[in-house]
Design a protein with these regions (language model features):
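Metallo-beta-lactamase
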Residues: 1-91, 96-102, 196-207
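Active-site metal-binding motif and surrounding structural segment of the metallo-beta-lactamase
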Residues: 3, 87-138, 153
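Short, polar loop motifs at secondary-structure junctions
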Residues: 59, 139-145, 158-160
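Active-site metal-binding loops of divalent metal-dependent hydrolases
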Residues: 76-78, 114, 175-177, 207-209
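Active-site environment of divalent metal-dependent phosphoester hydrolases
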Residues: 115-119, 143-145, 161-164, 178-180, ...
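Active-site-proximal loop/helix segments of hydrolase catalytic cores
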Residues: 122, 179-216
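Binuclear metal-ion centers of metallo-dependent hydrolases, dominated by the metallo-beta-lactamase
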Residues: 135, 147-166
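Flexible, acidic/histidine-containing loops and adjacent segments that form or flank the divalent-metal
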Residues: 156, 162-183
Length: 216
């Protein structure tokens, strides 16, 4: 594990001021919100007739995008739980609008940060099998995690680093957040948003963020 620790651009690191006791009290006494029924649509199946310029919200931070030259998938999470455990942890209330097997061929997969509700290794491994030529773009510090899972076609980025793919420039930008997948890796990998710019269209996907000077 890298010894490097990252902070936000304003030098904050989102260290929790709550004790474990306070967290557990909140966790087991909080009131669960009522489940909201969201109607899903199968209009996305018409994408084959509209081969470019579309954005489909699949769920949470997962979007299927096409900018006319590339098909892009952001923060792919298709598992039932955002957790390292299959029987515990936050469970999704609503199934993804599109299943992994229903997705079109994917060129680029972006990850904003390593929280389990944004970096789902099980989903990424399946996507690699379905799209062997897809390129994975991840924050600095997360490449090792993907390669350990057999995903080799990975590039990792610091803030403001960029890569151009088929006339689309991908730039990794600062956001106000933090990272961790366990108890001892807080802020050991970076977090950020993706700005995707081509000749015809610009797309920005922030992942998770609070408001900060980064957006001014």
């Amino acid at each position: 594990m890298s010894e490097e620790t990252f902070t936000n651009t304003n030098q904050t690191s989102f260290e929790s001021e709550r004790s474990l006791k306070e967290f557990l009290k909140w966790r087991f006494t909080r009131k669960q919100p009522e489940r909201i029924q969201i109607e899903t649509s199968d209009d996305w199946k018409q994408l084959e007739q509209e081969p470019k310029y579309y954005a489909v919200w699949i769920g949470h931070s997962t979007y299927l995008l096409n900018n006319g030259g590339l098909t892009i998938l952001t923060d792919p999470v298709f598992s039932k739980r955002a957790s390292p455990f299959s029987i515990a942890g936050p469970k999704r209330l609503i199934s993804p609008a599109i299943s992994l097997k229903e997705l079109p061929s994917i060129d680029i997969i972006t990850v904003s940060h390593n929280h389990y509700d944004h970096l789902d290794i099980k989903s990424l491994k399946t996507l690699r099998k379905l799209n062997p030529d897809a390129l994975f773009l991840v924050p600095k510090g997360d490449k090792r995690l993907l390669k350990k899972s057999g995903i080799e076609n990975v590039k990792e980025f610091l803030w403001w680093e960029e890569v151009e793919i088929k006339n689309t420039k991908f730039t990794f930008t600062p956001v106000q957040h933090w990272s961790a997948r366990g108890l001892r890796d807080r802020n050991k990998s970076l977090w950020g948003g993706w700005f995707m710019k081509s000749a015809d269209i610009s797309i920005y996907h922030a992942g998770d963020t609070g408001y900060s000077a980064d957006f001014k």
